[in-house]
Amino acid sequence: MKQKPAQPKGGQAKGGTQVKAAAPSNARWGLYTMAAIALWIITCFDNNGSYFTQKMVGVLCTVGMLCVMLFAGKDKVKRLMTPPAFALAAYMLLSAASTLYARSRKFAIAQFAVLLASFAVYLCIVLFSKDGKIAFRRAAGTIAAAAAPVGLLSIDAASCNILMRPVRVIMEAVGAGYGNTGAYFYSRLNTILGNPNTYAGLMSIACLLSLWLVITAASRSQKILCTVLLMVNAVSYLLAFSMGSLGVFVVACLAMLVLSPSDKRMDLFLLLVQTAVVALIVGAVSVKGFGDDVTGSFLPIIMLIAGCAAACVLEIFVREKLVARLADKGKLLIGLIAAIVVLAAVYLAAALNVTGSYTFGTESEFRRALDLPAGDYTLSMQADPSATVRITYKNTNNLVQNNETDLVNGASDAPVTFTVPEDSKLVFFYFGGEPGATLSAADYTGAKDGSVKLGYKLLPAFVADRIQDLTANGNVVQRGVYRQDAIKLWKTSPVFGRGLGGFENGVVSVQDYYYETKYAHNHYVEALCDLGILGLAAFLAMLGTSVWALVKSRKEKPLIVMLLGACVLQMFGQAISDVTWSVGCCLPTFFAVLALVTLHCGDCLKLKTPEKNKGGAVRWPVTVVSAVFIVLISLNLIAQSKFSSDSLTLDDLKQCASIDPFETNDYKLSYLISGGNEEDVASRYAADLSHVESNAISIPLAQYYASVGDYTKALDQLDRGAKYTRANASVWQKMFDLYEQMIDPVGSSIGAAQWLQDDTYVKRMVNGYETLCQVNADQLDDVLLTDANNSFLNKLLAVNTLDPYDFVEALTTFSTLGLDTAYLPDADGNGVPDCATVQEGSVTWGENGAFTADTDSVVTFAAVIKTDGDYDLTVQSSASVEAAVGDTAVALDASGKSTQPVHDLGDTENAMTITLRVPAGTTVSHVTYMKK
């Protein structure tokens, strides 16, 4: 009796012939389901959770990691004796060490907690997953399945909100972070993770895994399940439309094709085409069910279900047969690829030019962009019933700062005129209308004639919107600025870096204009900044050893290498432009992929160790570091719980500062501003904080020093804070607020007058103003002060001119001066007083606040008047002018002085305005508003 030849383990016979794998038991199905749920929970809470939530997840995962390392068998621990594992371990150890020397240990431990949770995922896969093709497939399916709910909930959250509503309640109950995320769609899916680009980093890996699962499915039921999984991941990935991620994804798919065995290449190619076509159709129709807020529309979910069904039908009844017919026809594959490239080029050309009217749906506006030459234009719109337009432009500075400058607002009921400046790079049109309104034409005439392309008939609306500014994209330019600033920070600590969170903490100290970002948007530069040359070397080693392991394993495991090669390319490729290696939504999945590389490809590089070796070189370092950080993070969580309690006392703050090495600065600062006055404790805390590099400590610490009468140290802290956060207008405004509280005797402490006995502090504060002027001269953007700041500076600059300095005159100036144009601040250095505005007409400004009207003009001056009383307005001018204080007209005599005093009640919060109507040719040389 003939026997069938034995099949090798893993479900694949010699020559690559696929065989049916044994179905997993119910217990194993339950285990994989629990693993997918656990990975999903870690992903969600590590991404959107508060720092407290991230650290809680991190410490729980670290406890699990400790148990795993203690009880894992020696053979399993030896799986880590391979270069890919060593590289990742080096990166983790450098990150761990950096939390103890980081400039901001608060940021560092939160970031490291995410890394700890991700490393726990890595160890669980390496130590508990079996080493075989079936085990690999199950692990890949678990990772892809963990991402699918994120995609499904993201689509639901921005449309019908049925699934996300109960999930949101549960997530918020466990930890804040999901209050309203994902509830809108503007040009792309915002996603429940709150960032389409990092979400795309997660879903791109899920899509690659899902593609591989479909082409390696051993049964029809597996194909159907994996096809549904693929469509959920692919549609949600496409709707996020992260152009950087999609660009890398295309390259990753090409790499997957190149690396795939010849008998799978046509299979994969047809699956890629099928998935792309179905996902594009589903996405294009689904967009109509999204809007600026939750729409309640079921269309996106219905289309997703329909897309899954269509893909399953195509998979079973079309693609399978095509694959069978086209097998072993490599030249045909090349021809098909060439044909698709040509068709794609033709389609793209047609899609960009076949346009028509635009009918508004649930979205309130859409944008279009044109590269228009400088000059005057008139825009005429045809709309039913009506539409609005807001026209803006971007110049080089706008691109760097990623903002726009408004030109004009208008409506379709009248022509809209606008002027494109000489330095314009791109002009944007934001059209708005009610749902159902149709904008049929938008024609412009002027320096160039033409029409704005409105409705792209062959492009999905979200794609049309995203491609508008490809030629002048502010995001791309601004990320270049982030990288440059990260390099500046790296130079302050080139070998070990500034510690995790070092970029977030220090970027304010090197900015040429104010912006807010936590990351450098390039992880190679981020690693260099945070962990120095050693950290970058470790990160590059992770990439290099992974590639090395894949190359060495390709002949033996071609199917596994084709997938992992594409995943590695995607992970490390998108790291060039996004923050995917810094956020909790991506890191657990990325570490899971690295675990698959270590387990299934790293064995070819495994170090040879004696049989008696128990893997202690790996086991004990990981165990010790895990135990140390379990203790440290637990102490941090205990301190944070006390700090957040309603019954917090000064003794609690001292205890928190003593047990928590990561957020001790917060407790010390809270102790000081809460009135802690134990002499040794308060002085020690203040001295400690005075040396901290922080973007948040200087102002409250200066307030503490001022409250105890140490004005010299208060001013030193303000100078230090202004230098460190030089581009932040809020810090400068608070700095001048504190100046005023310290030295202005009007409305402040009566004791403030003693600091006017001589001009020492006056000159220190004037020096602060001059520093601001220099900062504005050096930066791209100007730091402007509040009306209250400007009014205080008006008095301060007037006092500074007293020669010789006189205490009584200084007090009189602070008490009586409401406005004096001779001493108005001009922090931005444009020759115009910061409190002055030309409401109508045109004027030419001279020195000391004087100006000449070029045409009939209206000029206003804003001032904050602190004290109730009668005030005299005096306007010295070459001809008569009309004046008003607030809404009250003021009559002026021949000398320019008000004939009747103006009674001002005083308002320390709101500015009053002095309005002057000045005839053309008239020079106003001096304006004063003084208390009688």
Q: Where are the predicted features?
A:
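TM-adjacent membrane-interface loops and short helices in multi-pass inner/ER membrane proteins
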Residues: 162, 195, 460-474, 478-517, ...
